[in-house]
Amino acid sequence: MLASCHITSLSGILLLLCVQCSAQILINPCGDVPGVRGPCSANLRRFTFAYGRCVPFYYGGCLGTRNRFDSFVECERRCLGGPCNQTPGVVGRCYAAIPRYTYVPFPINSCVSFTYGGCEGNDNNFEDVNVCFNLCVFRRG
């Protein structure tokens, strides 16, 4: 996300606030310290990016770091990038039986079929095996 600042005066304070605001938005939250609960006492289930993957933790409701996401999918989208870098074969919590394809990087570097539940999965979920191969396998070599 890119912020824009509208300066209506040449005040040094406004300019400083603008620069600080833009810098905070451009810094990737995935690099912040993971899983910081904070000093408050709520038990909010959130996700944090740690050791190359998104994991759940309980957030206290205040302070902490920006490495905190409301959902697993949001964490993966922000921290892992495109669909080929996301966890393969996430079924989700629903019970539909939808045939899909997912990219598995290691150890096979290939697209395989899986059954998607119909909700909450992630973007490593393709309706067409050819799209999966073209996007994930052939581009990576």
Curated annotation (Swiss-Prot):
Alphabetized UniProt keyword annotations: Disulfide bond, Protease inhibitor, Repeat, Secreted, Serine protease inhibitor, Signal
Superkingdom per UniProt: Eukaryota
Disulfide bond recorded as keyword: yes
Disulfide bonds: 30-79, 40-62, 54-75, 84-136, 94-119, 111-132
GO-annotated molecular function: serine-type endopeptidase inhibitor activity
InterPro entries in alphabetical order: Kunitz_BPTI, Kunitz_BPTI_sf, Prtase_inh_Kunz-CS, TFPI/VKTCI-like
Tissue and organ distribution: Prismatic layer of shell (at protein level).
Signal peptide feature range: 1-23
Domain BPTI/Kunitz inhibitor residue range list: 30-79, 84-136
SMART domains linked to this entry: KU
One GO cellular component, as annotated: extracellular space
Localization, UniProt: Secreted
The keyword rRNA-binding is annotated on this UniProt entry: no
Primary location recorded for the protein, binned into one broad class: secreted
UniProt name for this protein: BPTI/Kunitz domain-containing protein 2
